[in-house]
Amino acid sequence: MRSSIDVHNHLLAEDVVHELSQLAGPLRDLSTAPGVLGLPPVAVGRPTLLADEDGAVVVLAPADAEVDTAGVAELLGRDRLDPVPPDRAPGLTGYLLAFVPPVALECPSTLVVDERVASQDVVYAAAGEPGVILKVRGADLVKATSAVVAPVTRQAS
């Protein structure tokens, strides 16, 4: 399994200024991070992992939003993209499903960032393990990863 050290080393190699913060306790997933950290949901990019025969797609969406998976597949022209089940995520990415980071995956991957998250000065995202969070400038993350930025979410009801 990979860890936040892999995320840190990847971002260092790309000259991306970032912070990894140890949390007081582990999060179940990033949907609870805004309340724990005192942040608006749009500042926390919660990962959704999709995959097809061409590799993985990590979608960062506001913590309170649902990803439009069909919309992401259409946006990327990859109609066979499907959500990755929790038991398959570690073998594919090297990380537990709820904590898949935006970088340093073991497989080929594309990063898609919802435009509301990408527009934030600072984005908080999974760092690869339950008790650690990644803090990075939204523009730096998009630039370093050549992320696709688009409106790919719908508000959770």
Where are the predicted features?
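Extended, low-hydrophobicity, polar/charged segments
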Residues: 1-157
